[in-house]
Each structure stands twice: as C-alpha cells, then as structure tokens.
A protein has these predicted regions:
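Right-handed parallel beta-helix/beta-solenoid
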Residues: 1-20, 37-39, 67
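Short, T/G/N/S-enriched strand-turn elements that build extracellular solenoid repeat scaffolds
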Residues: 20-26, 41-52, 70-74
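Surface-exposed loop/turn positions
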Residues: 30-31, 39
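Extracytoplasmic/periplasmic beta-strand context in beta-sandwich domains
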Residues: 44, 58, 100, 137, ...
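Right-handed parallel beta-helix
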Residues: 57, 61-66, 108-119, 147-163, ...
C-alpha cells in the first residue's frame, strides 16, 4: 500500500507497504490480500505457494478508489523453471531462469483479480529479438508437487508489456502461462489443473 509500512501487521488499519512483506505471509484458507488502488509496486513481484479450500478460497485483489494496483516487475521476481526431462526436440529449452510478476506455485482455490501487471524487458537494454533474453511472464502458474490443483480464478487483470524471449516457446513466456513440471516424487503424483477461469 502507498500508505503502508512493512513494520505493520498487515491488517486493514495497519497495511503493509511492499510485496516483499506479502510474500513472507503464511496465508491460510479464507485469507485476503488487498492492494491499495493507486499503488505502484516498482521492481516488485508477488510469488505465492498457498492453498485455500473450496469453502474458504484465498483472495488477492484491490481496495480503495482510483487506478488498479500496478505490479511493475521489470525483470525481477526470478525463479528457476525445470520440466525435469528434455522435451520433444533437443533444441527446445526445458530449463532456465524466468521472471514472473505473479507466480502461483502449486496454488489452488485462489482468486487473483483487479490488478495491473507488467514485466518490461527494456530496463536491461535487451532488444526485442535478443537470443538470450530473459523469459518473462505476467502471471505464471506451476503445478509440480501437489497433484491435481483446483479452481484458480484470474479476473479483470490488465496485463501488458510482458517482454520475454520470443524464441523459448516452451518456457514460461507471455501474459499468462500455466505449466505442469515433473514432480519430485513422480511415481506418487498425477499432475493436473482442474479448473482455470
């Protein structure tokens, strides 16, 4: 929140300031994270590994008046993507670093709405078609170690200027990109995302 402080407890009357503080929260079923409208989270990102329930989903949204809260990541929020196996052709990149403004890692029963998201590439002077340009996403969804994931709702998001690598079509690149990765205990997991809206 533009009126927050990371020393606060994150309640309505004592909001946090940065997404770094939000990323440290241990969100539980039924919890809400509301970002103040008019806030700009420059060079920040929202990376979550949370699970709500059907009865008590977790909600990420906005409050107040004015423009949608803007998460302007600019190539930050870097994580390592690894499918776990080579893909159908040896030239296809199957692992590497990705910058994601919003990362939903093994999340379920979660709603994210009413946000503006960008992840520009020009910050580091990368040209549009640079062959080793950073892979970027606005929203990345990953299913890996929790089996079937249920009900991820993305609504009223304005995602723009996500400038990733135009060649790595199998990596998380684009406005919204969901991927199933090889789980750590592959023999015990069946990966599926049952419902995305």
């Amino acid at each position: 929140s533009i009126h927050g402080d990371d020393a606060n407890d994150g309640t309505e009357n004592q909001p946090l300031k940065s997404l770094y503080a939000v990323n440290r929260l241990k969100l539980q079923p039924g919890d809400q994270v509301l970002l103040e409208r008019g806030s700009v989270f420059e060079n920040q990102f929202l990376h979550l590994n949370v699970q709500g329930t059907k009865e008590q989903p977790i909600y990420i949204g906005a409050y107040g008046n004015g423009a949608k809260p803007l998460i302007q990541t600019n190539g930050q929020g870097i994580w390592y993507q690894d499918y776990g196996n080579e893909l159908d052709a040896p030239t296809h990149v199957y692992r590497g670093y990705v910058s994601s403004a919003v990362l939903l890692y093994d999340c379920e029963y979660l709603t994210v709405e009413n946000l503006e998201i960008s992840n520009e590439g020009g910050v580091f002077g990368e040209t549009y078609s640079a062959p080793h340009k950073m892979n970027r996403t606005g929203v990345a969804g990953i299913a890996k170690n929790r089996g079937t994931l249920h009900e991820i709702h993305l609504s009223n998001l304005y995602i723009h200027d996500v400038e990733g690598n135009v060649y790595d079509k199998h990596m998380n690149n684009g406005g919204i990109y969901f991927t199933c990765l090889k789980p750590e205990a592959e023999d015990k997991k069946v990966l599926n995302v049952s419902r995305i809206r």
